[in-house]
Amino acid sequence: MCLLMLVLGAMYVQGWHSAGFGKRTLKKRCYPGQPGCGHCSRPNYCEGARCESGFHDCGSDHWCDASGDRCCCA
């Protein structure tokens, strides 16, 4: 059971949960200080990129929403 949780945890960290197990998408995960979460096309527009946790710096013109799921334009 513990090993299963470890494997699932590793898959979650790699972002497979957002792609449906194995199907990799072009969506980038955002980490604190990491640039390139996409470019802002309009104010307050949220992209589908994943954030490591809420309200981290997702690049110069992005922030993470409270759910930690999206990068939004400032």
From Swiss-Prot:
It is found in: Secreted. Detected in mucus secreted from ectoderm. One of its GO terms (cellular component) is extracellular region. Disulfide bonds join C30-C37, C40-C71, C46-C64, C51-C72, C58-C73. The keyword Secreted applies. The keyword tRNA processing does not apply. GO terms for biological process: defense response to bacterium. Residues 19-27 form a propeptide. Keywords: Antibiotic, Antimicrobial, Cleavage on pair of basic residues, Disulfide bond, Secreted, Signal, Toxin. One of its GO terms (molecular function) is toxin activity. Residues 1-18 form the signal peptide. Its main location: secreted. Potentiates activation of mammalian TRPA1, a non-selective cation channel involved in perception of pain, in vitro yet has an analgesic and anti-inflammatory effect in vivo. Has antibacterial activity against C.glutamicum (MIC=50 uM) and, to a lesser extent, against S.aureus but not against P.aeruginosa or E.coli. Belongs to the Cnidaria small cysteine-rich protein (SCRiP) family. Negative results: has no effect on mammalian TRPV1 and TRPV3. This is Tau-AnmTx Ueq 12-1.
